[in-house]
UniProtKB/Swiss-Prot annotation:
PROSITE patterns: RIBOSOMAL_S19 (PS00323)
Extent of the signal sequence: none
Keyword DNA repair in annotation: no
Protein name: Small ribosomal subunit protein uS19
Protein source organism: Cereibacter sphaeroides (strain ATCC 17023 / DSM 158 / JCM 6121 / CCUG 31486 / LMG 2827 / NBRC 12203 / NCIMB 8253 / ATH 2.4.1.)
Length: 92
């Protein structure tokens, strides 16, 4: 179920502060964040965020196409190694 439009997008408060500090300083450093649930806003375009996936911070460069999506969508948490091969079929 989608979020109600009257509530507006969810963004953690500390994330807005970090983005504002980064814009003021002018440095293009990776902003480490743990809030995968936050929505990407237009003021984040051009910034690089390190989104935590449970193990490390995955760098995400925000573009205009990403606006309205969640940060967690760009930092996968599970590693897929493929299905295990059938050992009986390998012997033949």
């Amino acid at each position: 179920m989608a979020r109600s439009t009257w509530k507006g997008p969810f963004v953690d408060g500390y994330l807005l502060k970090k983005a504002e500090k980064s814009r003021e300083s002018g440095k293009n450093e990776v902003i480490k964040i743990w809030s995968r649930r936050s929505t990407i806003l237009p003021q984040f375009v051009g910034l690089t965020f390190g989104v935590y996936n449970g193990k490390k911070h995955v760098p995400v460069n925000v573009t205009e196409e990403m606006i309205g999506q969640k940060f967690g969508e760009y930092s996968p948490t599970r590693t897929y190694y493929g299905h295990a091969a059938d050992k009986k079929a390998k012997r033949k």
